[in-house]
Design a protein with these regions (language model features):
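Flexible, acidic loop-helix segments that line cofactor/substrate-binding pockets
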Residues: 76-92
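Hydrophobic pocket-lining residues within nucleotide cofactor-binding pockets
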Residues: 24, 50, 83, 117, ...
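Small-molecule pocket liners
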Residues: 29, 84-85, 134
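Solvent-exposed alpha-helices and their adjacent loops that cap or buttress functional pockets
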Residues: 38-39, 43, 79-80, 126-128
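Flexible, glycine-rich terminal cap/loop adjacent to redox cofactors
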Residues: 72, 88-197
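Short beta-strand-initiation
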Residues: 4, 82, 131-133
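FAD-site-proximal beta/loop scaffold in flavoenzymes
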Residues: 3-72
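Internal hydrophobic alpha-helix adjacent to the cofactor/substrate pocket in enzyme cavities
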Residues: 58-81, 108-110, 167-172
């Protein structure tokens, strides 16, 4: 084999926290929270891996912000719709939003655009052969991006841009009109959007 990927799962660790003794609800070991990071017990919040949601450091950071804002009486909610996920391999594997399979399972009629990373001149210049692929998952009815995946070096540096488009439900036609600096690897996003009719 040329490449081997070993993946270990994660699970929340809520043992020995005494949560059951105060009545905090757990689901498969995860602390149940609402979109404000509140548990069912007033004054108790749960962020990070313990709530079993996204289980990524950058998600935990945002969940903590939401919890603090809620505690301070400021309006804020947590959305998991466009949390980027990255495997820091060579090349990197990045994803945000829904995969094609997840979108179809939700009953969405989707189009998929796959383009080689060679569409980005800078990517080709900085990566021998320009190997890699970028994929957009597009809701055909709403004409918005619902997901993206990339197998490409430094895809972690541009995948969050797609996350913003997903979170704000930016129409694909506006993405096509967005001007990206040239030469950048992030141009691949617009290039893929332009492949959708």
């Amino acid at each position: 084999a040329d490449r081997v990927l070993v993946a270990l799962g994660r699970r929340p660790n809520s043992r020995d926290l005494g949560l059951e003794s105060v009545g905090v609800l757990l689901e498969n070991g995860a602390v149940r929270t609402d979109c404000h990071m509140r548990t069912n017990v007033p004054g108790i919040y749960a962020v990070g891996d313990v709530n079993g949601k996204s289980m990524l450091a950058h998600t935990a950071y945002r969940e903590a912000e939401v919890a603090v804002h809620t505690i301070l009486g400021q309006k804020d909610t947590m959305s998991y719709r466009a949390i980027p996920s990255v495997l820091y391999t060579i090349p990197e594997l990045s994803s945000v939003g829904l995969t094609e399979e997840e979108a179809k399972a939700q009953g969405l009629d989707v189009a998929v655009v796959r383009i080689p990373m060679a569409y980005s001149g800078r990517y080709v210049a900085e990566n021998e052969n320009g190997d890699g692929i970028f994929k957009l998952v597009i809701d055909k009815k709403l004409r918005t991006v619902v997901g993206a995946q990339a197998l490409a070096n430094y895809s972690s540096e541009f995948i969050a841009v797609v996350g913003v488009f997903i979170e704000l439900a930016v129409p694909i036609d506006l993405i096509k009109k967005q001007v990206f600096p040239h030469p950048t690897v992030a141009e691949i996003i617009r290039e893929a959007a332009c492949q959708f009719a």
